[in-house]
Design a protein with these regions (language model features):
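Flexible, gly/pro- and Lys/Arg-enriched active-site loops
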Residues: 13-14, 20-175
Length: 175
C-alpha cells in the first residue's frame, strides 16, 4: 500500500484519476475479454470523455481493443517486461502507470477488473455506465465502499440501437 501512497502523492496535485466503466446490474463488465453488450451510445460517451487524456489499462484490455485509441495517451500495465506495442507506453505496475500520467490533467483507468481493483484507492472520480440488464459475464467490477463515494451526477438514457436502458452516473470521492 505504501507504493499507492507514493503514487498518489506524486500525482494528486496535478492529475485527476478517474475510473470509467460500464457494468450490468450484477457488476459484470466482460466475458471472454469482450463486452457482453452492444451499446454504441456508451462507446461514443467513452470516446468523448477520454479523448485528449491519458488512459491506463491492463494488457488484456489492450488486447481486446487491439490498438492504441486515437487522441489518447495509452499506458498499458503488464507484468511481461518484453511486451511492447507501437503508440503505447508500458508500465510494470499501476504505480508506474500513474507516474507516466503525472503531467496530464486527467487520467482514466479503463480496465480490466484487476487494474480497477489495484487502482480504486487512487481514484478521485468514477464514471459508471449502469446498464439496467443482466448479462452472462466472467469478469466483474470490484465492490466499492459506498461511504467513500457520493453520487454527483446521473443521466438516465435509453439506447435506440440496443433497446437497453442505462444511466451514466458520476461518483466523486468523499474527502
Amino acid at each position: 500500500m505504501a507504493a499507492f501512497s507514493t503514487c498518489a502523492a506524486v500525482i494528486m496535485s496535478q492529475t485527476r484519476i478517474s475510473l470509467i466503466v460500464a457494468m450490468d446490474r450484477k457488476r459484470g463488465i466482460g466475458i471472454a475479454n469482450q463486452l457482453p453488450w452492444k451499446l454504441p451510445e456508451d462507446l461514443a460517451h467513452f470516446k468523448r470523455t477520454t479523448t485528449g487524456h491519458a488512459i491506463i489499462m491492463g494488457r488484456k484490455t489492450f488486447d481486446s481493443i487491439g490498438r492504441p485509441l486515437p487522441g489518447r495517451h495509452s499506458i498499458v500495465v503488464t507484468r511481461n517486461p518484453d511486451w511492447r506495442h507501437e503508440g503505447t507506453q508500458v508500465a510494470a505496475t499501476p504505480e508506474q502507470a500513474c507516474a507516466l500520467a503525472r503531467h496530464e490533467q486527467e487520467a482514466f483507468i479503463i480496465g480490466g477488473a484487476e487494474i480497477f481493483e489495484q487502482t480504486i484507492a487512487l481514484a478521485d472520480r468514477m464514471i459508471v455506465t449502469e446498464i439496467d440488464a443482466e448479462f452472462d459475464c466472467d469478469t466483474f467490477f470490484p465492490q466499492v465502499d459506498q461511504a467513500s463515494w457520493q453520487e454527483t451526477g446521473r443521466e438516465s438514457l435509453h439506447s435506440a440501437a440496443s433497446g437497453l436502458d442505462y444511466a451514466i452516473v458520476t461518483y466523486d470521492r468523499v474527502r
